[in-house]
From Swiss-Prot:
Keywords: Cytoplasm, GTP-binding, Hydrolase, Magnesium, Metal-binding, Nucleotide-binding
GO annotation, biological process: ribosome biogenesis
Biased composition (Acidic residues): 364-384
Gene assigned in the entry: obg
Primary role: An essential GTPase which binds GTP, GDP and possibly (p)ppGpp with moderate affinity, with high nucleotide exchange rates and a fairly low GTP hydrolysis rate. Plays a role in control of the cell cycle, stress response, ribosome biogenesis and in those bacteria that undergo differentiation, in morphogenesis control.
Binding residue positions for GTP: 166-173, 191-195, 213-216, 283-286, 314-316
Required cofactor(s): Mg(2+)
Binding site for Mg(2+): S173, T193
Protein biosynthesis is among the record's keywords: no
Protein name, entry field: GTPase Obg
Organism: Yersinia pestis
InterPro entries referenced in this protein's UniProt entry, alphabetically: G_OBG, GTP-bd, GTP-bd_Obg/CgtA, GTP1-OBG_CS, GTP1_OBG_dom, GTP1_OBG_dom_sf, OBG_GTPase, P-loop_NTPase
Ranges of residues in domain Obg: 1-159
Predominant subcellular localization, coarse grouping: cytoplasm
Entry EC no(s): 3.6.5.-
Length: 390
C-alpha cells in the first residue's frame, strides 16, 4: 500500500433542526395551547485513532465529510431527531491542524483516542418554550444554528524511539536491516529510500525499541532540494537520533563536510529537533584501514566540535552494531518516555448557544409585558408568526 503522510479534508457538522410553531387542536379542545417541539441537534464529527491503519491514503480520494442535520421539531411537543455523528478513523500518530488558523487541534497518540473536530449546531426552540402568563398563544420559534465547518490538515508522524538521519547512501537502510526484521530497499545509488520505514529492534525477550529510517538529506534540503525536509517531521517524536556518517563516500567527498551539511539542515528545520539527544555513528569502517577510519572520525569530530561519545560500525558486516544497540537500549531505559500530549478537558460550562436562546426568551417576555392588555382574545388568529434568527 502506498505510504501517504499528509491529507487535507473538509469537515462540516450538521445544522440544528428548527423549532416548530403548533397549537393543540382536538375534539372538544379548540384552544389547547402551544405544543410546538424543539428541533434536534446537528451531528458532530470525530476522529478516532486506529492502530490498524498506517497511511492516510484513503483521504486523498474522499476529502469531504458532512454530518447529518437535526430534524425539525413537530407538533405535540415532539422533539426532532438528533443528526447522526460521523467518526473518521486515522492512524495512531496523526497530528490534526486547522488550515484556517494554523492551530494544532490535537495529536492522536493513543489507540482508541477520540477527538471532536466539528461541533454540530444547536437545536431551535418550539413555540411551547415561549408561553407565559401574558403570552398564552405564542407564535415565536427559533431556528437551529449552523454546524461548525473546518478545513483540516492531517499529518501522520511515525511513533519511534530512535530516528536515523544522514546523507543518501550513508547506510541507514542497511543498518535497520541489520538490527531488525524490516527490509527496506538497499542499492548503491542515492535516494533508494523514498518513504519512511519502521523496524523493531529486539534485544531480548523483554527489551526492545522502535527505530525509524527516513529518506536521506542533501545540502539545500531546507529549500526543497532532493526530497526536501518533509520527512524530518517523522523524527519529532523520537527520543534519540542516530546521525550516520559515511566514512568512505562513493563520490569521494569530504565526510566532515557531509556531516556538517546534516547538522545545518537540522537546525534550519527546527531548533527543537536540533536540540534532541543526537549520537554520532561512523559507518562503513570495513571499506578502509582502521587507522584511516580513526583519522577521518577524529577530523569529523573536530569539524563539528563534537564533545560526546561516537561509534564506529559496519552495518553491512554488523561490526560493533550489537554494542551500539545495547547502549541505545540502556539510554532509553534511563530516560522517561515523553509525556503524551494531554487531552484538553473542557471546563464544565453551559453550552455556547444557551445564552442565545435565553436572550430570545427574555426578549419575548419583555415584549409581552409591554403589550399586555385586558382585551386579549385567545381566539384571535391574526397574530404574526415570529422567527428569531441568529
Amino acid at each position: 500500500m502506498k505510504f501517504v503522510d499528509e491529507a487535507a479534508i473538509l469537515v462540516v457538522a450538521g445544522d440544528g433542526g428548527n423549532g416548530c410553531v403548533s397549537f393543540r387542536r382536538e375534539k372538544y379542545i379548540p384552544n389547547g395551547g402551544p405544543d410546538g417541539g424543539d428541533g434536534g441537534d446537528g451531528g458532530d464529527i470525530y476522529l478516532l485513532a486506529d492502530e490498524n491503519l498506517n497511511t492516510l491514503i484513503d483521504y486523498r480520494f474522499v476529502k469531504s465529510f458532512r454530518a447529518e442535520r437535526g430534524q425539525n421539531g413537530q407538533s405535540r411537543d415532539c422533539t426532532g431527531k438528533r443528526g447522526k455523528d460521523i467518526t473518521i478513523k486515522v492512524p495512531v500518530g496523526t497530528r490534526v491542524l486547522d488550515q484556517g488558523t494554523g492551530e494544532i487541534v490535537g495529536d492522536m497518540v493513543r489507540h482508541g483516542q477520540r477527538l471532536m473536530v466539528a461541533k454540530g449546531g444547536f437545536h431551535g426552540l418550539g413555540n411551547s418554550r415561549f408561553k407565559s402568563s401574558v403570552n398564552r398563544a405564542p407564535r415565536q420559534k427559533t431556528m437551529g444554528t449552523e454546524g461548525e465547518t473546518r478545513e483540516l490538515m492531517l499529518e501522520l508522524l511515525l511513533l519511534a524511539d530512535v530516528g536515523m538521519l544522514g546523507l543518501p547512501n550513508a547506510g541507514k537502510s542497511t543498518f535497520i536491516r541489520a538490527v531488525s526484521a524490516a527490509k527496506p530497499k538497499v542499492a548503491d545509488y542515492p535516494f533508494t529510500t523514498l518513504i519512511p520505514s519502521l523496524g523493531v529492534v529486539r534485544m531480548d525477550y523483554e527489551q526492545s525499541f522502535v527505530i525509524a529510517d527516513i529518506p536521506g538529506l542533501i545540502e539545500g534540503a531546507s529549500d526543497g532540494a532532493g526530497l526536501g525536509i518533509r520527512f524530518l517531521k517523522h523524527l519529532e517524536r523520537c527520543r534519540v537520533l542516530l546521525h550516520l556518517v559515511d566514512l568512505a563516500p562513493i563520490d569521494e567527498s569530504d565526510p566532515a563536510e557531509n556531516a556538517k551539511v546534516i547538522v545545518n539542515e537540522l537546525q534550519q528545520y527546527s531548533e527543537n529537533l536540533a536540540e534532541k539527544p543526537r549520537w554520532l555513528v561512523f559507518n562503513k569502517i570495513d571499506l578502509i584501514d582502521p587507522e584511516e577510519a580513526e583519522k577521518r572520525a577524529k577530523a569529523i569530530v573536530e569539524t563539528l566540535g563534537w564533545e560526546g561519545k561516537y561509534y564506529m560500525i559496519s552495518a553491512a558486516n554488523r561490526d560493533n552494531v550489537n554494542a551500539l544497540c545495547w547502549d541505545v537500549m540502556s539510554f532509553l531505559n534511563s530516560q522517561p518516555k515523553a509525556m503524551a500530549i494531554a487531552e484538553s478537558v473542557p471546563e464544565k460550562v453551559e453550552f455556547m448557544w444557551d445564552d442565545y436562546h435565553r436572550e430570545q426568551l427574555a426578549e419575548v417576555e419583555a415584549e409581552a409585558e409591554d403589550d399586555w392588555d385586558d382585551d386579549w382574545d385567545e381566539e384571535d388568529d391574526d397574530g404574526v408568526e415570529i422567527i428569531y434568527e441568529r
